[in-house]
Structures are given as structure tokens and as C-alpha cells.
Regions:
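C-terminal motif of bacterial Sec signal peptides marking the signal peptidase cleavage site
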Residues: 26-29
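Bacterial signal peptide processing site
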Residues: 31-34
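Terminal, low-structured helical/coil segments at or just beyond the last alpha-helical repeat
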Residues: 36, 209-262
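Canonical tetratricopeptide repeat
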Residues: 50, 84, 118, 153-154, ...
Length: 262
């Protein structure tokens, strides 16, 4: 009797253990399926964001919106999805939705300097320079941001638009300290100097850059303007020839023709 009792006592436990194991396998299977579905949805969202951005670049905003709406359904917690949608709404002129989407992107990726920089660009383009500059500097000081010199240059451009040139000068100089071969920062600094009548430092900056690094169309056209303002026709012609040879058919080459410096 006791033997039967022991056997009866073990059987339920044995069955229970098997049931628990089966349940664990089922749960693991569900978790695996959920993870796979989430990964597939994320990949689909990434693809639709790429398509949406491509359509935006082509000016097809209707198709862009369709792709980005799909991306949002597939991965509503993606900062990249919200950032792309923010750019779309900005293009559509819907500032409220654009701002909300940029904020959503930052909510899902608060420390991502790309998202911070993107929002800063939007803020500056819409006259919110104080907020924009603050965001640019936040991105520039982020240790994982690979191009802080670009953020400092953007901050300077934003400050110039707000007629805060001396603060802009500091940010352009910071950018060049971080990356001396960053042509955009050199152009912006030399252009600021030119606008303030500081012809000698503007010319020195242009010549120093071109003599060490690759020239750009913007720097060469500015070189023409600076040299002409200095009355140095030979230097102006030298810049002009290089612009025509190295960058034919560009907007800068056409602007050169309009200056009558070709």
C-alpha cells in the first residue's frame, strides 16, 4: 500500500516536470518568434525609410509620405523613422508636425548626436537660432559624434543668420582647430572676414588652405572676390582660372562669369 502510495506520489510530480518543460519550450518559441518578427519589422522600416528619403530627394513627397507612414507602422519606436518623417513634414510646410517628429526622434534616441544635429538644422532654418545653436553645441560636445567640426560650423552659420558674427567667428575657429582641412569652416570664416572688410586675414586663410589642402569651388570664388577687393588682378585671375579648370559647369563657375572675372 505504501509502495503504491509512493508511486502515486511520484507520478504527478513527474507529469508536472514534463509539463513545465513543454511550457518553457513553448514560451521560448514564442519569444523567438516575437524577436524574429520584431527584427523583420525593423528591417522593413529601415528599407522604407531609405525609399522615403530617396523619394523626398526626388521631390515626390506623396510617395515619400506613403513609405514613411509604412515605416512608422513597422517600427514606431525608431528614431530614424521619426527623424525622416520630421524632414518630410518640414518639406510639406507643417511645422507643428515636423517639430513633434523631431522631438519624438530625440525621445527614442536622446543621446544620438545625429538626431540632435538634425533638429538643430531645423530650428535654425526656422529662425529659432538660440535653440538651434544650443543643440549644435550639444552635438559637437558629444564624445561619440564623429564630425564635431561640422556641428561647430553649423552653429556658426546659424549665428551669422542671427547677426551674431563674433560668436560665429569663434565657432568657425573651433571647427578649424578640430579639423584644419575642413573646407566649409575655412570658407565660412573667410567669408565672414571678407564681409567685415578684413581682407588680409581672409586672403591668408584662403591661400593657406589652398596651398595645403584641396581647393573647393566656394573658396576659389571667394578668393576672386577678395583679390579683386584688394586690387590684385593677377591673383584674381589665378583663382578664376583654377575655378574654371577644376570646377567647370558649377554654380560657382557661372557666378564667376557673372562677376566678369573669367
Amino acid at each position: 500500500m505504501s509502495k503504491h502510495s509512493n508511486s502515486a506520489g511520484r507520478a504527478p510530480g513527474h507529469v508536472q516536470l514534463i509539463s513545465s518543460a513543454v511550457a518553457a519550450l513553448l514560451l521560448a518559441g514564442c519569444a523567438g518568434n516575437s524577436a524574429q518578427k520584431a527584427e523583420k519589422a525593423h528591417e522593413a522600416a529601415v528599407y522604407n525609410v531609405q525609399l522615403g528619403v530617396a523619394y523626398m530627394n526626388q521631390g515626390d513627397l506623396e510617395r515619400a509620405k506613403d513609405k514613411l507612414d509604412r515605416a512608422l507602422q513597422q517600427d514606431p519606436n525608431s528614431a530614424d523613422v521619426h527623424s525622416a518623417r520630421a524632414q518630410l513634414f518640414a518639406r510639406l510646410g507643417n511645422k507643428d508636425k515636423a517639430d513633434a517628429e523631431y522631438r519624438a526622434a530625440l525621445r527614442f534616441a536622446p543621446n544620438d548626436p545625429r538626431m540632435i544635429n538634425n533638429y538643430a538644422v531645423y530650428l535654425c532654418q526656422n529662425g529659432r537660432s538660440e535653440e538651434g545653436v544650443k543643440r549644435f553645441l550639444e552635438a559637437a560636445r558629444n564624445p561619440i559624434y564623429p564630425t564635431p567640426e561640422a556641428a561647430y560650423t553649423n552653429a556658426g552659420v546659424c549665428l551669422r543668420a542671427a547677426k551674431r558674427d563674433e560668436e560665429a567667428r569663434v565657432d568657425f575657429q573651433r571647427a578649424l582647430q578640430l579639423r584644419p582641412n575642413f573646407a566649409e569652416a575655412q570658407f565660412q570664416l573667410a567669408n565672414l572676414q571678407f564681409d567685415h572688410g578684413e581682407l588680409a586675414p581672409a586672403r591668408a586663410g584662403i591661400d593657406g588652405f589652398i596651398g595645403t589642402y584641396n581647393a573647393t569651388a566656394d573658396l576659389l570664388l571667394l578668393g576672386v572676390r577678395v583679390a579683386r577687393a584688394q586690387g590684385d588682378r593677377i591673383a584674381a585671375q589665378r583663382y578664376a582660372r583654377k575655378l574654371q579648370l577644376d570646377f567647370p559647369g558649377t554654380d560657382q563657375a557661372r557666378a564667376l562669369a557673372a562677376l566678369g572675372a573669367g
